[in-house]
């Protein structure tokens, strides 16, 4: 059966949005409970947030052909979403907030829009890395670090597997020092 255009599609979209928002809200509630010294309550909020994430994933998958797409497709989707947010959505929201006299909120929309632009640029670079075969291979020697055990390798390419902990190449990343 075709889902597109049905009430069920609309209901799935609403369920996905509701579960996604609940997850975030419960995460915020957990943080507040923890700060107030209610560790058990924080843990219950965190557990419920994890449940809501899984509920949202059920609805998301049903809306998207039964699965989550491959990483390259997901990066392209994410980049396009971030582009919309900084070029259209937040720009429009800022204009409307300013027209209504909410200058502080307008400024926040503009500043978040700048962050969304950075997100898009980061995703576009990752897309180029995948398409160019440059995720685990570079043109010059790099310091590669295993994210599991911390093993360091210097070279143009990350090893197929870590010689220390045996984790696959996917655990290697270019070591970044920002300290």
Predicted regions and their residues:
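Non-heme di-metal
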Residues: 1-179
């Amino acid at each position: 059966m075709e889902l597109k255009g049905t009430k069920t599609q609309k209901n799935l979209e609403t369920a996905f949005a509701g579960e996604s928002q609940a997850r975030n809200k419960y995460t915020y509630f957990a943080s507040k409970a923890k700060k107030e010294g209610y560790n058990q309550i924080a843990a219950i909020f965190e557990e419920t947030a994890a449940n809501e994430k899984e509920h949202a994933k059920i609805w998301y998958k049903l809306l998207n052909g039964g699965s989550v797409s491959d990483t390259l497709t997901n990066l392209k989707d994410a980049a396009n979403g971030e582009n919309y947010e900084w070029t259209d959505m937040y720009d429009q929201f800022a204009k409307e907030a300013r027209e209504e006299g909410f200058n502080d909120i307008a400024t926040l929309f503009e500043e978040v829009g700048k962050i969304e632009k950075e997100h898009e640029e980061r995703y576009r670079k990752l897309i180029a890395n995948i398409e160019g075969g440059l995720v685990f291979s570079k043109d010059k020697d790099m310091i590669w670090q295993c994210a599991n055990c911390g093993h360091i390798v210097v070279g143009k390419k990350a090893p197929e597997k870590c010689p220390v902990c045996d984790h696959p190449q996917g655990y290697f990343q270019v070591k970044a020092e920002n300290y």
